[in-house]
Amino acid sequence: MLILRQLMDAYIRQKRASPGMVQASDLQMNRPMSGMRSNSRELHAYDGPMQFIGSPQNPDQILSNNSSSITMNSSRNNSNNMRSLSTINQEDLIEEISSHELEDEESSPVTVVEQPIAPQSANSAHSQRARIGQPSFNDTLDEEDYANRNISGVAAVRPAGIGSPYKEGAAMEGSNGAANGSGSVGGSGESEGDVIGQIDQFVMQPAPQGVLYKCRITRDRKGMDRGLFPIYYLHLERDYGKKIFLLGGRKRKKSKTSNYIVSCDPTDLSRNADGFCGKLRSNVFGTSFTVFDSGNKESTDSPRLDLAVIIYDTNILGFKGPRNMTVILPGMTEDDQRVKISSADPKQQGILDLWKMKNMDNIVELHNKTPVWNDETQSYVLNFHGRVTQASVKNFQLVHDSDPEYIVMQFGRTSEDVFTMDYRYPLCAMQAFAIALSSFDGKIACE
């Protein structure tokens, strides 16, 4: 083996001395020494001929213009002396190499030593996390959270009960501190909803009173263009980990504003698909979104109806704080059906126009529940009752001003591409899913 290595060494030197080969750089290799090593010699984690760096026989040594012939002669002399090199004691050579500890320090496993951290300020806690390798609060945010946080000045909302990101061993469980009353998600005396009838009809039907629908949204960003135009899937959660597909949504590529197509057919998310249920369209700034059903705005037999309007408060000055949103829905009749409102009908006003004119007779106004600032966690928190486990600027709960404890809808992140979405009366699956899609969309001037 030693003879073969020396032959290969000589061949490489001869090959590099030939015309047309790229010569080695004159930069010196100075690897930083690890503080854990007591050996004072500089080490290079190379095996084979590269271990002779720094020796007179370095194959990467700098060659001058008139040194090619000298190198050629040296190569021939080394070939002639190869037999004498075989007499070197192999055990001494192995012992010499092993004493250099030729282990790549960059590939060595890093052991994180956990140490208790005393309560401290955010700045000192940040440096402490860097020393002990603890993930920071921002590590739980995805790229959309960073974009909304840096551009819009919004702050992420943390589920209540999750420990401080600046403390060791933060728990990732929902809080049980608040009582599960009739207004809380999953409260007593409330049944979990199930699909009744056909999917296309069920997703448009308002939820019955006293029934809670627990859903899950999955974001699919795999594929050529799904990094910019992901597909979102809505499933109804059932017992024992089972789930039922309800809706799918994707952002249209060729559109002047954000435009999402929603369909109950996961294989065909297009405007002309049989499963087309409606769409979500935003204004230029991404501050206002309107939800429409599958009707045709040019038709008089089945006109397009307004299902909801989502308005995000602008934040021109960039003040830090949770994102504020207002959701306007059509009012409900005595038999728990939506009031038909169509902005496409020139004879009547749409939901947004009615809200701007303060004509609240046939519309319902919802707001996001204001998160509470927690001094211990140094973040805004909401009690999601265990349904949301990660902080995000997209986490929210919708309530009515007359009953802030009755959560109409809540939405939040549980992993990088998985979100929970729970809704109840008077929302339907289509409305709730569209509201969640508006939260995913990028917002330049929103808080």
From Swiss-Prot:
GO terms for cellular component: ciliary membrane; cytoplasm; nucleus; rhabdomere. Its main location: cytoplasm. It is a peripheral membrane protein. SUPFAM superfamilies: Tubby C-terminal domain-like. The modification Phosphoserine is found at S136. Residues 54-84, 168-191 are annotated as: Disordered. Residues 62-84, 168-182 have a biased composition (Low complexity). Keywords: Cell membrane, Cell projection, Cytoplasm, Membrane, Nucleus, Phosphoprotein. Belongs to the TUB family. This is Protein king tubby. It comes from Drosophila grimshawi (Hawaiian fruit fly).
